[in-house]
């Protein structure tokens, strides 16, 4: 019988704590940090960085093709692979954004 009373007391305490927590509820909104970039700015910076990587890879490949000194084939291949990986990552991010948009648009209202 003692366990039944203990259980009821515990449940009453939990309910009172729940009601207290619900009374203190505030809307979820993170404070805006000064100088923090927005999502669109971050995405734009990422696209610009991928573009710079691809342009650097192309410039290095062109320099190797014309026989410019100081440009090694291994450096050209590494730059090419960096550009390829960064472009593939950007493509995957785009795909995830499109999928998230489609999921949100298909949600019932």
UniProtKB/Swiss-Prot annotation:
InterPro entries, per the entry: FliE
Keyword vocabulary terms for this entry: Bacterial flagellum
One of the protein's GO biological processes: bacterial-type flagellum-dependent cell motility
GO cellular component term, pick one: bacterial-type flagellum basal body
Major subcellular site: other
Pfam families: FliE
Molecular function via GO: cytoskeletal motor activity; structural molecule activity
Localization per record: Bacterial flagellum basal body
Family: Belongs to the FliE family.
PANTHER family: FLAGELLAR HOOK-BASAL BODY COMPLEX PROTEIN FLIE (PTHR34653:SF1), PTHR34653
Name of the molecule in the record: Flagellar hook-basal body complex protein FliE
Organism the protein comes from: Pseudomonas aeruginosa (strain UCBPP-PA14)
């Amino acid at each position: 019988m003692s366990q039944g009373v203990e259980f009821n007391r515990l449940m009453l305490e939990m309910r009172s704590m729940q009601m207290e927590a619900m009374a203190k509820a505030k809307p979820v909104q993170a404070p805006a940090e000064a100088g923090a970039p927005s999502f669109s700015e971050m995405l734009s910076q990422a696209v610009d960085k991928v573009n710079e990587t691809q342009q650097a890879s192309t410039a290095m490949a062109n320099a190797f093709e014309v026989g410019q000194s100081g440009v090694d084939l291994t450096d050209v291949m590494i730059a090419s692979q960096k550009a390829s990986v960064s472009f593939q990552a950007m493509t995957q991010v785009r795909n995830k954004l499109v999928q998230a948009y489609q999921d949100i648009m298909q949600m019932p209202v």
